[in-house]
């Protein structure tokens, strides 16, 4: 499995069945510390709130940290609880597994490295909020949320 290079990215919400939906779309957008991460268009006033530093750790997992302007402290993709449809919080950065979607070069499933019997915990979108979605580990469950990582 190809690993993502460390760098600054914008993260666009797509799906495994439609990894390149064309123009437009919604991007992971920070609204402040301890607040849910949103999915917003890549336009003003959101543009500067959609810049993320993605770093691979020694264990092969990644942190996704907000890299925008005027950040008094470090925060990134995090969670208070990992329950179905719980929001992704901009908080103390947690580690995630990035799984490349087959037949793509820059589309990944973002998975929380949590041991749950029979399920994968993945980052998706509900409404305009990033949330944790649960899917069977056997790959069933249909179209899955994925993210196009576009280097800045």
Swiss-Prot record:
Is Translocase tagged as a keyword? no
**UniProt entry tagged with the keyword Ligase:** no
Question: Could you tell me which InterPro entries the record lists for this protein?
Answer: Prot_inh_I48_clitocypin (IPR019508)
Tell me the superkingdom of the source: Eukaryota
Q: Which Pfam families match?
A: Inhibitor_I48 (PF10467)
Q: What are the GO MF terms of this UniProt record? A: cysteine-type endopeptidase inhibitor activity
Q: Print the keywords alphabetically.
A: Protease inhibitor, Thiol protease inhibitor
Tissues/organs with expression: Expressed in all analyzed tissues, but expression was higher in the pileus and in the lower part of the stipe.
Family, similarity comment? Belongs to the protease inhibitor I48 family.
Describe its assembly: Homodimer.
Known role: Binds and inhibits cysteine proteinases. Inhibits most strongly papain and cathepsin L, more weakly bromelain and cathepsin B while it is completely ineffective against cathepsin H.
Question: What name has this protein been given in UniProt?
Answer: Clitocypin-2
Q: Which gene is the coding source of this polypeptide chain?
A: clt2
